[in-house]
Design a protein with these regions (language model features):
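Conserved Rossmann-fold cofactor-binding substructure of NAD(P)-dependent oxidoreductases
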Residues: 222-242
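Flexible, Lys/Arg-rich cytosolic regulatory linkers and terminal tails that connect or flank
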Residues: 79, 103-166, 278
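Conserved Rossmann-fold NAD(P)-dependent oxidoreductase catalytic core, especially the SDR/UDP-sugar
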Residues: 116, 131-132, 245, 249-252, ...
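Strand-loop microenvironment adjacent to phosphate/nucleotide-handling motifs in alpha/beta enzyme folds
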Residues: 157, 313, 317-496
Length: 496
């Protein structure tokens, strides 16, 4: 979980109940489900060091109703909401093992608990070198409470595609790039080149590899992808076989003002990387895109869609004599990335509020960083070239609901302890994001969370004309850039 880069603030956070400070009162707690893990918690929760008063087990087995397990009463519940019983008994804490209850029941229970200021804990095995292992408690993190299913790469063919290969990750010190590098580093590549223009984050990822994956042969290159001469030295030196191109600028309002940087990095940086990959015979090129590339209303989204189209054009061009497999992966917001709304809300809660939300109806798709990167790697392994892969991101989440949930997780009451203030949509922002245009269709893959978008190939002549025009970037006004992007980017309707 530390790879995700953030923790939810909670009023009382602890990992080992035996290390908790003694307090003058004990909060009541109930355990949901009678199973070996939960039964082993009884000793911890009833010890003299515990901060809790264990009231009961609550179980779906009606045969256990009124009986005792490990000296603790068991309540069997029926259709009546569990929270109603918890409120009646004044129980402010529960222990819940994810997956114990049917998914819908579990979701409703967690939602009800959050709305009623009842804290939800999960059992966790505490390893102790001096004594026998013991069960203890840990709070759920936000990803778990958003009901994101954990994804594991279990297909050995996926790992085999990257083993003993020379892999380049651009933007390798960023939120997505660094996680891609960490996951790929565990696949035993021949060499892993992590490239970024940000010095401090690149140093931090270097320290991570030295400490956690010392067996991986890594190289850390401080290079700007828009500098052709410097970038080419990396290709000439290492001869990468696989490229994950994650280098990009992503913040919508900032790039509306700094539109030339969006074009320079997101479009020309991608073009340079593609040209070098073609020149040096790279086998596979994976472009990391965004759902903001679909029907964009801002320059950032339009630049990312243009970059996707550059990949499609390069795949079909005559220069692709080595049949380099070029593909794009498209997904939504990631939890805990640099500058994400979750990090912002966390800071605002810590400061006592208010939490700022742009609009009461704005909603977004969310994924965890590890989840997104695992799907990128899986798509990269299955891709034969020319595809745009879309990920199943579950249901979209209203940002105001996310804000309220985080406030309650912090033990506060929304709009009482911490205010929520609506500030208005920023330039280029939409109420909702899409992963597919209305006219496009999808094709399934062997992975249930990955589909292929069926989209028309861009007009090569128009692409080349626009690239020539954009070469004059330093002399272009924002309006001129927008007019050029509108000629080629499907569905681009600037917010003005």
């Amino acid at each position: 979980f530390t790879l995700i880069g953030f923790r939810i603030l909670v009023k009382i956070t602890f990992q080992n109940l035996n290390q908790g400070n003694k307090i003058s009162f004990r909060e009541s707690i109930a355990i949901i489900g009678v199973n070996p893990h939960n039964i082993s918690l009884v000793e911890t929760l009833t010890s003299s060091q515990s901060n809790f008063n264990l009231v009961c087990f609550i179980d779906t087995n009606k045969g256990l109703n009124g009986k005792k397990v490990a000296g603790i009463n068991v309540l069997a519940y029926n259709k009546k909401p569990i929270v109603a019983y918890l409120r009646w008994k004044g129980i402010k804490n529960i222990v819940l093992t994810k997956g114990y209850l049917p998914e819908e029941v579990e979701e409703n229970l967690i939602e009800d608990c959050i709305n009623n200021d009842i804290k939800v804990y999960k059992p966790e095995l505490l390893e102790n070198n001096n004594t026998r292992n013991k069960e203890t408690l840990k709070t759920y993190n936000l990803e778990e409470l958003l009901f994101r299913e954990t994804i594991e790469i279990k297909n050995p063919k996926v790992i085999e595609q990257f083993r003993n290969k020379t892999i380049l990750v651009t933007g390798g010190a960023g939120s997505i790039g660094s996680e891609l590098a960490k996951q790929l580093g565990s696949f035993e590549p021949k060499e892993l080149i992590i490239l970024d223009q940000a010095e401090t984050p690149l140093y931090e990822i270097e320290m991570y590899f030295k400490k956690n994956i010392p067996s991986c042969t890594c190289h850390f290159e401080l290079v700007d992808v828009t500098n052709l001469e410097e970038f080419e030295t990396v290709f000439n030196k290492y001869r990468p076989e696989i490229i994950f191109h994650a280098a990009a600028y992503k913040h919508v309002p900032l790039l509306e003002k700094n539109f030339k940087q969006a074009i320079k990095v997101n479009i020309f940086g991608t073009k340079i990387c593609l040209d070098l990959a073609l020149k040096y015979g790279v086998n596979k090129f994976v472009y990391v895109s965004t759902d903001k590339a679909v029907n964009p209303t801002n320059i950032m989204g339009a630049s990312k869609r243009f970059a996707e189209m550059l990949g499609q054009t390069a795949y079909n061009c005559k220069k692709n004599v080595h049949k380099m497999q070029i593909m794009s992966t498209r997904f939504g917001n990631v939890l805990g990335s640099n500058g994400s709304v979750v990090n912002l809300f966390q800071e605002q809660i810590l400061a006592g509020g208010p939490i700022t939300v742009t609009h009461p109806e704005v909603n977004r798709f969310f994924m965890t960083i590890p989840e997104a990167c695992k799907l990128v790697i899986e798509a990269a392994a299955m891709g034969a070239g020319g595809q745009t892969y879309l990920f199943d991101m579950g249901r979209s989440i209203k940002i105001v609901d996310l804000a309220e949930k985080m406030i309650r997780l912090a033990g506060k009451i929304p709009n009482k302890d911490i205010k929520i203030v609506f500030t208005g949509l920023r330039p280029g922002e939409k109420l909702f994001e899409e992963v597919l245009t209305a006219s496009a269709e999808t094709l399934p893959t062997y992975h249930p969370k990955i589909v292929i978008a069926k989209e028309e190939n861009p007009c090569v002549d128009t692409m080349e004309e626009i690239m020539v025009y954009l070469q004059r970037l330093n002399h272009l006004e924002r309006k001129e850039v927008i007019e050029q992007l509108k000629l080629i980017v499907p569905g681009f309707v600037p917010y003005e």
